């Protein structure tokens, strides 16, 4: 009796900010592990999304959006994390938005020229293209810029052609051992996922009011004697005025954020959650490498 062959590969999902990389990953996995919002650079960390079906294991690396401006330390770190992912994988999915092509897209493409991994171009949000006849000449122009292995128009939000993209990825996997147990969907801890859920709710309920330099630190994550997860989250902002915005009038804003975050955590963790949130001013944290290291933005 012979052992069944197994196939495995690492696939980086790259692109400029806000083109739908995290939405695509969540759609492929069939569940939410990477937060999404309309705000650019929602993803700040490299996150692995793992899908195992039978002999095949796809390990997707969701990266922060690559962009030209690097004004603050946190922006430089996110660019570094995204760029380093390109050199460590077996395949790259380059996500762009419809018929738009920006300087940031061009910068990402130039970084891909040094990779030996095959690159799939995923043209996302095709359902938003009003003039459909513009798509074909755009695809032709992009195909002349780079030797893409495949060009696939998709809608990550609606799921259009995502199965075609994933089928191409799976058929390209090389023989190899699985790196994670079959029930794993991410390499990130529950503590990390809790902080990301809170950050997503901040973005959703504050919109344009939300300062870019806001982050979340989980100060406590423990199970009490009743089996409930007790989670304490600290929201860090840079100015006193930002703290007041997050708390809201009579604490209403932070109450809504906490209620929605707790509901999402209970669904994700399949466990009852007691969540407490505080807001603290920490001036200059997004430019302080020691602070960024303690918050998990810099790998040791």
Curated annotation (Swiss-Prot):
Main location per the UniProt record: cytoplasm
Gene3D superfamilies found in the cross-reference section: 3.30.300.20, P-loop containing nucleotide triphosphate hydrolases (3.40.50.300)
Residues given in the record as GTP binding sites: 15-22, 62-66, 124-127
Compartments in which it is found: Cytoplasm; Cell inner membrane
Membrane topology recorded in Swiss-Prot or TrEMBL: Peripheral membrane protein
Region (G1): 15-22
GO BP, sorted A to Z: ribosomal small subunit assembly
Name of the protein described by the UniProt record: GTPase Era
Gene field: era
């Amino acid at each position: 009796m012979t052992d069944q062959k197994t196939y495995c590969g690492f696939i980086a999902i790259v692109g400029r900010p806000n083109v739908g990389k995290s939405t695509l990953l969540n759609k492929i996995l069939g569940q939410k592990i990477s937060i999404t919002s309309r705000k650019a650079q929602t993803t700040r960390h490299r996150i692995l999304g793992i899908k195992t079906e039978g002999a095949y294991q796809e390990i997707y690396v969701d990266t922060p959006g690559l962009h030209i401006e690097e004004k603050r330390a946190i922006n430089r770190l996110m660019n570094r994390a995204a760029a380093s992912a390109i050199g460590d994988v077996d395949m790259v999915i380059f996500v762009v938005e419809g018929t738009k092509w920006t300087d940031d897209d061009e910068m990402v493409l130039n970084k891909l020229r040094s990779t030996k991994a095959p690159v799939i171009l995923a043209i996302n949000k095709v359902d938003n293209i009003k003039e459909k006849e513009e798509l074909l000449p755009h695809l032709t122009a992009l195909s002349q810029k780079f030797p893409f292995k495949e060009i696939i128009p998709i809608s990550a939000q609606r799921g259009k052609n995502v199965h075609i993209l994933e089928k191409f990825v799976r058929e390209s996997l090389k023989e190899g051992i699985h790196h994670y147990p079959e029930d794993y969907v991410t390499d990130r801890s529950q503590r990390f996922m809790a902080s990301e859920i809170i950050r997503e709710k901040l973005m959703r309920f504050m919109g344009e009011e939300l300062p870019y330099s806001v982050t979340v630190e989980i100060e406590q994550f423990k199970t009490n004697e009743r089996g409930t997860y007790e989670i304490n989250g600290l929201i860090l902002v840079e100015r006193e005025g930002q703290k007041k915005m997050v708390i809201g009038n009579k604490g209403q804003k932070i109450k809504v954020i906490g209620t929605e975050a707790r509901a999402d955590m209970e669904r994700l963790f399949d466990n009852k959650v007691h969540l407490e949130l505080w807001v603290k001013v920490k001036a200059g944290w997004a430019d302080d490498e020691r602070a960024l290291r303690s918050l998990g933005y810099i790998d040791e």
